[in-house]
Amino acid sequence: KKSSITFTNEEGEQEEEDLVYNRTDFWTTSSNKQLNFVQHINTLLNARGKAAVVVPDNVLFEGGAGETVRRKLLETTDLHTILRLPTGIFYKPGVKANVIFFDKRPAGPERQTKEVWVYDFRTNIHFTLKQHPMTDADLEDFICCFHPENRHQRHETWSEDNPDGRWRKFAVQEILD
């Protein structure tokens, strides 16, 4: 059975051999566990399923198979939001992570993602699990900006006049170029 909503964080700490998965339902073959995890989540969603997936930065910036996975996500899903997480909350210290939010759409001739909203919760922010843990209150601004069901109500807080604003919209072509 396909899922309508998935929120998940891939366990990145396990030591295991590099395996290359050659699945016909994946967009590309890779030994990168995080890229395979994103592809796997996509296969679990029903035609209108929604996902929020915690991924390390390399999923957003890696070339080769990483670029293929990103392009396919932009083409076949509405990858509408990226939440750039501060260091020290999910992974070992120094590893940079994000939450990517995407909605699966039925296949069509046009690219499904038109724009991507990015909330920079990383710049000048740091948490630790024990001494300075993140709380619900720390996410209030993101939640106010997010509007998951009414994205037309979103408004950027970043501008050239307000470079400290954390909420910014990018046209998908800006990301692809």
Segments the model singles out, each with a brief description of its role:
Residues K1-D177:
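A conserved structural/catalytic subdomain of Rossmann-like adenosyl-cofactor enzymes
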